[in-house]
Regions:
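Negatively charged
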Residues: 1-348
Length: 348
């Protein structure tokens, strides 16, 4: 029960290295700087929590954050940006005192905490969360992250959630309920150490944007997307950009009827040798810029239809091993070669 005489606030230690979250009546008695939990500051690039770093001025002095036992009685509805750009933050203690049962917005909560190695999320209640966008963006030092307790049944936005988590080698998302999610854009972007990713439990029936979803996942050797429902997806631009270790990719379940963006979709997939796109309907696609650029091991693209797209500069640039109806010609790399009669496609 929240006592109206109590106040949620954040206290900065005198040496500016410790942030402590309190919910009590003692704010006026504490030495040093304090901010109300809703206090913000405005800079050119946006509005930020008063105690955090900003895009223009990241915080490099805070080393630890602590949730005092008093904070357990507070019920925030947002934790967005609470630790944003605290670049030297190494530990968060007392997370068991943070009750997130009423929190709807966790966007950017740990964004830019590039020194955090672990975060204990076992007590996190995400049952009312709607937005987890950018939640762990640029947490570059995280080597493990247990989100198995997350209830994501009400979440609609998880774009860029793990973007830049370049030290994560594995991620168990088997408990994730994505049935309401509509935006998966950049979700695993820059997760360059991930070697496997099991998304078999993902329900993507409401997803409209999956662009850059696996961008830069350069250590992924396999990726099973057979369970993906792509019937509402409109943008898959850059979806597999830089997945340089993928040796195969089965997209036979992809429904592309609503898609209009495929720019850079496979750019830099330098280990792919064949792609079966015979099920692709690209009639609405208006951007195929650099779609297969740099796929220098790609020998065969199976597709029985002719694709037409005005914005297709360098679509096949660097596909030096590719051969369809005709062998690869470095002077012909746009969508005029996206056909099985006089181009680089092979009939299946």
């Amino acid at each position: 029960m929240q006592n109206t005489n109590q106040e949620a606030y954040v206290h900065l230690s005198a040496d500016e290295t410790i942030l402590t979250f309190y919910y009590d009546t003692l704010r006026a008695e504490r030495d040093g700087t304090t901010w109300g939990i809703d206090d913000t500051k405005i800079e050119d690039k946006g509005e930020f929590c008063a105690w955090t770093g900003t895009i223009e001025s990241p915080n490099t002095s805070v080393l630890s954050a602590v949730f005092d036992a008093s904070f357990r009685d507070f019920r925030p509805t947002t934790t967005a940006d609470w630790f944003l750009l605290l670049q030297s933050l190494k530990s968060i203690e007392g997370l068991e005192h943070l009750n997130t049962s009423q929190v709807k917005n966790m966007n950017n909560m740990f964004g830019g905490c590039s020194s955090l190695v672990t975060i204990n999320l076992e007590n996190f209640d995400t049952s009312n969360a709607r937005a987890l966008s950018h939640m762990f963006i640029d947490c570059k030092s995280l080597t493990s992250l247990d989100v198995s307790s997350f209830d994501t049944s009400k979440v609609w936005d998880i774009n860029f959630m793990f973007y830049g988590c370049e030290s994560l080698t594995s991620l168990d998302l088997s408990s994730f309920d994505t049935s309401k999610a509509c935006d998966l854009r950049g979700m695993f972007m820059g997760c360059s150490a991930l070697t496997t990713l099991d998304l078999s439990s993902f329900n993507t029936s409401e997803v409209t944007n999956a662009s850059c979803m696996f961008f830069g996942c350069s250590s992924l050797t396999t990726l099973d997307l057979s369970s993906f429902n792509t019937s509402k997806m409109m943008d898959v631009g850059g979806m597999f950009n830089g997945c340089s270790s993928l040796t195969s990719l089965d997209l036979s379940s992809f429904d592309t009827l609503m898609m209009y963006e495929m720019f850079e979709m496979f750019i830099g997939c330098s280990s792919l040798t064949t792609l079966d796109l015979s099920n692709f309907d690209t009639s609405l696609v208006d951007d195929m810029y650099q779609m297969f650029c740099g796929c220098n091991s790609l020998t065969t693209i199976y597709c029985n239809s002719t694709w037409n797209c005005e914005m297709s500069y360098s679509m096949f640039a660097g596909c030096t091993s590719l051969r369809g109806a005709v062998p690869y010609d470095e002077s012909k790399t746009d969508a005029s070669m996206a056909n099985p009669e006089t181009g680089y496609f092979s009939r299946k």
